[in-house]
Amino acid sequence: MAAVSLTVSTVKPLGDRIFIKVSASEEKTAGGILLPDSAKEKPQVGEVAQVGPGKLNEDGSRQTPEVSIGDKVLYSKYAGTDIKLGGDEYVLLSEKDILAVVS
């Protein structure tokens, strides 16, 4: 089996799935205390990197996704599958797990 090189451009989400680049979590508290990895909150904000074609409806049509590549979004805390690519963190989740588009 040939090795597959994963990059953001080679990841094509299926259905209503969205591929999000996770925003970096805070390294320090407001008081300047450095946080160990175990004490950091899991980020819930990121930028949409790839978008699937949309949910397939019962009649065979597709429901167009409400987000686009480049949108900054807020998503459910424990949603999706965490993926690391090239030192960056991503999450692959269903569109229903996106709570809001942040402007």
From Swiss-Prot:
One of its GO terms (molecular function) is metal ion binding. Pfam families: Cpn10. One of its GO terms (biological process) is chaperone cofactor-dependent protein refolding. It is found in: Cytoplasm. It comes from the Bacteria. SMART domains: Cpn10. Keywords: Chaperone, Cytoplasm. GO terms for cellular component: cytoplasm. Heptamer of 7 subunits arranged in a ring. Interacts with the chaperonin GroEL. Together with the chaperonin GroEL, plays an essential role in assisting protein folding. The GroEL-GroES system forms a nano-cage that allows encapsulation of the non-native substrate proteins and provides a physical environment optimized to promote and accelerate protein folding. GroES binds to the apical surface of the GroEL ring, thereby capping the opening of the GroEL channel. HAMAP family: CH10. Belongs to the GroES chaperonin family. This is Co-chaperonin GroES. It comes from Prochlorococcus marinus (strain AS9601).
